[in-house]
Amino acid sequence: LGAAYEKAHPGTKVDFNFAASGVLLQQISRGAPVDVFASADETTMDQAQQQDLLAAGTREVFAVNALWVVVPPQAKASPRTLKDLAGAGVQRIALGNPDSVPVGRYAKGALEAAGLWPSVQGKTITTQNVRQSLDYVARGEVDAGFVYAT
């Protein structure tokens, strides 16, 4: 995407800053230079808009994602449904911090909607971002983790 933009606009250099949406919002609110802010959730975009950090009329939904539960390749228990996460075979679940990480808010919301949050809340290991959840899963430090399909 950056290379295509640079090609279409000679002399322009695109720099990316990838981080959790809340972290990026804090950087922007403290004056970090930015031309495009792509948040992983509507809540963070709402906060940016409430803080007048978005140019009027520029907010657009340009992509969507799906929430996935992933398990380590060597997992003994392989949950197939959200309900399986409440079972005895799943002891630790990586979940982005619902207070600050969009994937965590979405995961908690899905578990609440399924009536499972009380059963799994004590099993959750909160992470700072999706990448950390995925790393915990890849290393087999948790039995499952919530990530985005992408």
Task: State what each model feature region is.
Residues 1-18, 22, 26-30, 39-42, ...:
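Exported/periplasmic ABC-transporter solute-binding proteins
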